[in-house]
């Protein structure tokens, strides 16, 4: 029997039977021994099983039409962007599944995504919804907090740590996750001419991001922060991580107009008529993005461009009421726990939408406006047992009157 044999002084592995002289190290446990070779083999078996589980999950990726249906349940408008995202995400995970399970000689490159759209148009929410529907780890990073190596700030590898943490430190699962990098337009080069001074927040960060976006084996500090000598690192391969980057790119429509041979408003007549800036956003090509300040190599790793439109008041009202997790439904549910019915007048919903447009916050500002309107109600209602219904009026939203209360 393998193990510690009493007839000699040698120690044997309880699993493979090799003696301590035949292996590098034997670890003693409670009545059992295991050699370094069996430890390595066990780790390899576990790693393979985890990878198989991940691939099995990816094999069930919804088709583009199914992804679009899921997005439609949560995201109002942005139909062109949703279709582009659905196709890109499906193709990405199809590529991951087939390249890991076949010996095809064709090298399928991944299609990372660039989303361009104004603040509050739904860029972050689209990325979050996709990751949730696919049941893959998801992490968000702000490009403005990143700096290139050697400068005070956050290393790009810390983005990968967020993804690893979202995967509960299951690296194999993290390697098939989605990372959304917001405010990518804020690290554009300031002008097309390269400065002789160091560009801490611009081109240098783009170059650092480029390495992990195109696919590399990165060393990530387990606790975040800067790397230190002799520090244990987590190794993660980024070749199958889907990167979605987004930004407002304020003013890029002027670059599109110039390329199309039109003069910017205020400097002359246009030679070609396009209805509005939203239409110009659909005309964006890589040349415009490069002129804005992203380097060609970085743009080349973002072949899918999805342009999001500025949300109208009607869009914002639909966002308030239609999605499965619509804000109006959430607040109605909250008050129902106190036995109170909540109703919003149609002109109250429009007033909320108008406030969000006035503040230039888009959809992300809707919750704070409702919170302002509902604060006193949510404070008083739990103590007023005779109230059965609350009606939010336009005047209540504008702050000129209180919500209407109905009692039993």
UniProtKB/Swiss-Prot annotation:
Binding site for Zn(2+): 13, 16, 35, 38
Domain of life: Bacteria
The entry's keywords: ATP-binding, Chaperone, Metal-binding, Nucleotide-binding, Zinc
Subunit structure: Component of the ClpX-ClpP complex. Forms a hexameric ring that, in the presence of ATP, binds to fourteen ClpP subunits assembled into a disk-like structure with a central cavity, resembling the structure of eukaryotic proteasomes.
One cellular component term from this protein's GO annotations in UniProt: HslUV protease complex
Domain ClpX-type ZB: 1-54
Molecular function terms from GO: ATP binding; ATP hydrolysis activity; ATP-dependent protein folding chaperone; protein dimerization activity; unfolded protein binding; zinc ion binding
Protein role: ATP-dependent specificity component of the Clp protease. It directs the protease to specific substrates. Can perform chaperone functions in the absence of ClpP.
Signal peptide: none
Family annotation (InterPro entries): AAA+_ATPase (IPR003593), ATP-dep_Clp_protease_ClpX (IPR050052), ATPase_AAA_core (IPR003959), Clp_ATPase_C (IPR019489), Clp_protease_ATP-bd_su_ClpX (IPR004487), ClpX_bact (IPR046425), P-loop_NTPase (IPR027417), Znf_CppX_C4 (IPR010603)
CDD domains, A to Z: RecA-like_ClpX (cd19497)
Family (UniProt): Belongs to the ClpX chaperone family.
Protein name: ATP-dependent Clp protease ATP-binding subunit ClpX
GO biological process: cell division; proteolysis involved in protein catabolic process
PROSITE patterns assigned: CLPX_ZB (PS51902)
Residues the record lists as binding ATP: 118-125
